Amino acid sequence: MGIRKYKPTTPGRRGSSVADFTEITRSTPEKSLVRPLPKKGGRNNTGKITTRHKGGGHKRQYRLIDFRRHDKDGVDARVAEIEYDPNRTARIALLHYVDGTKRYIIAPNKLSQGDFVEAGPNADIKPGNNLPLRNIPVGTVVHAVELRPGGGAKMGRSAGASIQLVAREGRFAQLRLPSGEIRNVDVRCRATVGEVGNAEQSNINWGKAGRMRWKGVRPTVRGVAMNPVDHPHGGGEGKTSGGRNPVNPNGQREGRTRRPNKESDKLIVRRRRTGKNKR
């Protein structure tokens, strides 16, 4: 994948760029693997906004991605197509299994049309193959990693993501996540070999607000720029800093909100670097 830069023909074009989509081999999805995706506009079943800055955007269909693959152990599959997915930053690969089944998976780097992939404990260590962590050599780069055995891939699914298997002790494997955190994961959990493709995604310059609106992202307005009726930070004579701890429009504390005594914290070997310690 590469990045195509636009010439500055208009203010919105100046500096903006777009993916060149050279790896895409098919423009329409497999009909049997798509489902309707109605827009919610960031609202719940009562109509209340639960996620701000969402609304509008282009219509989408949801592509069903196989994040487990355990039911296809030992069954070879050919990569029929590499496709664009509007619901994620990574590309997706359409697999045609020898038993006639069709499935989508996250497309790893260096996987191309016509390649063969497989799943199972005896699969080769090559991009696109899915194995339990106990069968993957230490030092291997993986993606689409399960947190619980059989629970489906939860980590390392976005464009360019890679997780390294750094050690294995007893029933746990130690993984270095993209954030720098090192975490214990059950060796029965499965992972896919290789890093996620489309790594240049993070270098795209969207150029104008309108392109974000096409994606369904609405403007983010600072609370201190609002009136008191709209936000606890609003109002004041002239420019003010808010005068209180950061809160959301409902008055609830914002910022560092991660629970320090989360049950899964015991599996963290080394925390990710944050704030002043991030170097």
Curated annotation (Swiss-Prot):
One of its GO terms (cellular component) is large ribosomal subunit. Residues 50-59, 269-279 have a biased composition (Basic residues). InterPro entries: NA-bd_OB-fold (IPR012340), Rib_uL2_dom2 (IPR014722), Ribosomal_uL2 (IPR002171), Ribosomal_uL2_bac/org-type (IPR005880), Ribosomal_uL2_C (IPR022669), Ribosomal_uL2_CS (IPR022671), Ribosomal_uL2_dom3 (IPR014726), Ribosomal_uL2_RNA-bd_dom (IPR022666). Signal peptide: none annotated. Gene3D superfamilies: 2.30.30.30, Nucleic acid-binding proteins, Ribosomal protein L2, domain 3. Coiled coil: none annotated. Disulfide bonds: none annotated. GO terms for biological process: cytoplasmic translation. Residues 1-59, 224-279 are annotated as: Disordered. Residues 253-268 have a biased composition (Basic and acidic residues). SMART domains: Ribosomal_L2, Ribosomal_L2_C. It holds the Pfam family Ribosomal_L2_C. GO terms for molecular function: rRNA binding; structural constituent of ribosome; transferase activity. Keywords: Ribonucleoprotein, Ribosomal protein, RNA-binding, rRNA-binding. PANTHER family: LARGE RIBOSOMAL SUBUNIT PROTEIN UL2M, RIBOSOMAL PROTEIN L2. Belongs to the universal ribosomal protein uL2 family. One of the primary rRNA binding proteins. Required for association of the 30S and 50S subunits to form the 70S ribosome, for tRNA binding and peptide bond formation. It has been suggested to have peptidyltransferase activity; this is somewhat controversial. Makes several contacts with the 16S rRNA in the 70S ribosome. Part of the 50S ribosomal subunit. Forms a bridge to the 30S subunit in the 70S ribosome. This is Large ribosomal subunit protein uL2. The gene is rplB.
